Regions:
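Histone-fold recognition with a strong bias for associated Lys/Arg-rich disordered tails
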Residues: 1-112
Length: 112
């Protein structure tokens, strides 16, 4: 049900959280991983997005607002906001009778 690109983005978002020593996994981690994905970049550029600026702003946000942990979590805990985005993404796909979820669905759910 989840497309390959989306799986890669989820895995990279977990890696980003670990690298930044964050014990929680947020929407911003997921968005930052999307900014490193070719399909995500393509969609955002077609909408007029400045990828470099969005990366910088998202990194700044994560460093400023997400607490640094001395220990690296093996599995950062998803925030309730991230849970809602995932639920919304799945719900939209089910309601439109689609069998798979892709990067576009993720971005639509984040912007919702």
């Amino acid at each position: 049900m989840i497309g390959q690109n989306l799986t890669l983005i989820f895995n990279e978002s977990i890696d980003i959280a670990k690298e930044m020593h964050h014990n929680i996994l947020t929407t911003e981690h997921l968005f930052l991983a999307t900014l490193n994905n070719t399909q995500g970049i393509s969609i955002l550029q077609k909408c007029g997005g400045n990828i470099q600026e969005m990366r910088q702003m998202t990194n700044l946000y994560l460093k400023k607002y997400i607490p640094y942990s001395q220990e690296v979590s093996k599995s950062p805990k998803q925030t309730p906001a991230l849970d809602r985005i995932i639920e919304s993404m799945v719900s939209h796909a089910q309601n439109s009778n689609r069998q798979s979820i892709d990067v576009g669905d993720l971005l639509a759910s984040i912007m919702e």
